[in-house]
């Protein structure tokens, strides 16, 4: 489901690594 959408390198690289900048995505990755 959601993992497929965040599979993009550009998106994942910024929000996945910098969870502080994207707190909204924090619950999706945790």
Curated annotation (Swiss-Prot):
Q: Name one GO biological process term.
A: lens development in camera-type eye
Q: Where is the Beta/gamma crystallin 'Greek key' domain?
A: 1-30
Which keywords label this protein?
A: Eye lens protein, Repeat
InterPro entries in the cross-refs: Beta/Gamma-Crystallin (IPR050252), Beta/gamma_crystallin (IPR001064), G_crystallin-like (IPR011024)
Q: Name one Pfam family in it.
A: Crystall
Q: Which domain of life is it from?
A: Eukaryota
Name the Gene Ontology molecular function terms of this record: structural constituent of eye lens
On whether Mitochondrion is a keyword of this UniProt record, the answer is no
State the domain notes.
Answer: Has a two-domain beta-structure, folded into four very similar Greek key motifs.
Q: Subunit structure, per the record?
A: Monomer.
Q: Which family does it belong to?
A: Belongs to the beta/gamma-crystallin family.
Q: What does this protein do?
A: Crystallins are the dominant structural components of the vertebrate eye lens.
Instruction: Spell out the PANTHER family in the cross-references.
Output: BETA/GAMMA CRYSTALLIN, GAMMA-CRYSTALLIN D
Q: What is this protein called?
A: Gamma-II crystallin
